[in-house]
UniProtKB/Swiss-Prot annotation:
The gene is sdhE. One of its GO terms (biological process) is succinate metabolic process. SUPFAM superfamilies: YgfY-like. Coiled coil: none annotated. An FAD assembly protein, which accelerates covalent attachment of the cofactor into other proteins. Plays an essential role in the assembly of succinate dehydrogenase (SDH, respiratory complex II), an enzyme complex that is a component of both the tricarboxylic acid cycle and the electron transport chain, and which couples the oxidation of succinate to fumarate with the reduction of ubiquinone (coenzyme Q) to ubiquinol. Required for flavinylation (covalent attachment of FAD) of the flavoprotein subunit SdhA of SDH and other flavinylated proteins as well. Belongs to the SdhE FAD assembly factor family. It is found in: Cytoplasm. This is FAD assembly factor SdhE. PANTHER family: FAD ASSEMBLY FACTOR SDHE (PTHR39585:SF1). Its main location: cytoplasm. One of its GO terms (cellular component) is cytoplasm.
Amino acid sequence: MQRHRPLGQVPLSFSARHTARWRDEMDEQTRLKKLRWRCRRGMRELDQLFGRYLDQRWAQAPDAERAVFLQLLDCEDDKLWRWFMGYEACPDVANAALIADIRALPA
């Protein structure tokens, strides 16, 4: 019977340098998967907008912008919908700027 190694355990043949890089890549992949799951909303349109941001901007976004994006994910869907569609102005300036940037991303 073959024993499987636990998830996240590094094969012994990897050098220390490769091990650290592998772990960092795995951590980033795991974080991105969890973030993509958080982006799933009750509305397909919001799913598409947030997914577009993850695909096109997240990797190169500065930490401050990432923090604003995470703050947006904590907002209620109905508020997000009204802000993204322009029915209401977002009261937070940083959120409003990121919403405008996300709306401007190509489909």
